[in-house]
Amino acid sequence: MQSIPIKNVGESRLVDPFQRQYYYLRLSITDQCNFRCTYCLPDGYQPEANKPSFLTLKEITHLAQAFAEMGTEKIRLTGGEPTLRKDFISIAESITNIDGIRQLAVTTNGYRMAKDVADWKKAGITSINVSVDSLDPKMFHQITGINKFDDVMRGIDRAFEVGYNKVKVNSVLMKNLNDKEFEQFLAWVKDRPIQMRFIELMQTGEMDSFFDKFHLSGQVLADKLLKNGWTLQHKSHTDGPAKVFTHPDYAGEIGLIMPYEKNFCASCNRLRVSAKGKLHLCLFGEEGIELRDLLQSHEQQGILQARIFAALQGKREHHYLHIGDTGVRNHLASIGG
């Protein structure tokens, strides 16, 4: 575990040595997932014996309050599959009530959406990202290991019915698996306010051979979009890393997340906390800085914020994926992607 000094630095804002400001926290609330996606957990979730439990509701609330006081405006609940937690609604309601948090998002595999999305909206979830790696039910089953395509599609429709104006859909781009569905995805968003986001496959410790076989640069899709009249949009300060393209003839949008692109890290605006309370400065970085010992009471907030600020001063300018350094991450389910 990395050791970080805890000198109290007062109400420090979340700014790193390269003057990047961090308004966005990705908070994993569980490692558990009920899907078996080929690029993430092909063998399914394997619980580790004698390991710490996931953060409690109280600990999550203390954490979110500390980040909000330091300037965080957006929190995304991730996993694993975050909606597997029985107290998911309580977690959402607690974070929604924190001053300064303007957006509360969730990334989900969508298996519970048709049933529960109305409750998510009531609890304060402002935006939803759903994973849909194929519009072909058979390919969806092959990639996810689960025969739930129709359920996920019903969930997306239900999200619009309960009042969400836009739904973001994530698809991990994989050569010779779903890359040939690009035109089908375009047709799908023609009349639907969906931001369809293609995420370039990322190398992790356990998935080197998979990466070598299936990686495809997102630039291939960017070139197609620009050639066919799509326009790159400007980002707001809380937006994620996606390059978003729009077209006057389409209700939906296309987003591309390309971590191997030059200067990808220059606009970094997010930090990550794992489901067991470790701060991660980069998806492909160190093993994490322990925060959980400072999440036990509100009186610890000042020291907690000082530790977060001190840790941020050690953030690297960029990742080293381009030279094959994936950090210590074996798979993305352990940190929420």
Curated annotation (Swiss-Prot):
**Keyword GTP-binding tagged:** yes
For this UniProt entry, the molecular function terms from Gene Ontology, in alphabetical order, are:
4 iron, 4 sulfur cluster binding; cyclic pyranopterin monophosphate synthase activity; GTP 3',8'-cyclase activity; GTP binding; metal ion binding; S-adenosyl-L-methionine binding
Q: Where is the chain membrane-spanning? A: none
Positions that bind GTP: R26, R76, T107, K168, R270, L271, R272
Q: Which Pfam families match?
A: Fer4_12, Mob_synth_C, Radical_SAM
Query: Can you quote the record's cofactor note?
Result: Binds 2 [4Fe-4S] clusters. Binds 1 [4Fe-4S] cluster coordinated with 3 cysteines and an exchangeable S-adenosyl-L-methionine and 1 [4Fe-4S] cluster coordinated with 3 cysteines and the GTP-derived substrate.
**Which residues are in the Radical SAM core domain?**
17-243
Which EC number(s) does UniProt give? 4.1.99.22
Database matches in SUPFAM superfamilies = Radical SAM enzymes
Q: Which InterPro entries does the UniProt entry name for this protein?
A: Aldolase_TIM, Elp3/MiaA/NifB-like_rSAM, MoaA, MoaA_NifB_PqqE_Fe-S-bd_CS, MoaA_twitch, MoCo_biosynth_MoaA/MoaC, rSAM
The cofactors it requires, by name, are: [4Fe-4S] cluster
* Pathway membership: Cofactor biosynthesis; molybdopterin biosynthesis
Instruction: Identify the residues that bind [4Fe-4S] cluster 1.
Output: C33, C37, C40
Described function: Catalyzes the cyclization of GTP to (8S)-3',8-cyclo-7,8-dihydroguanosine 5'-triphosphate.
Q: What is this protein called?
A: GTP 3',8-cyclase
Organism name: Haemophilus influenzae (strain ATCC 51907 / DSM 11121 / KW20 / Rd)
Q: Which gene encodes it?
A: moaA
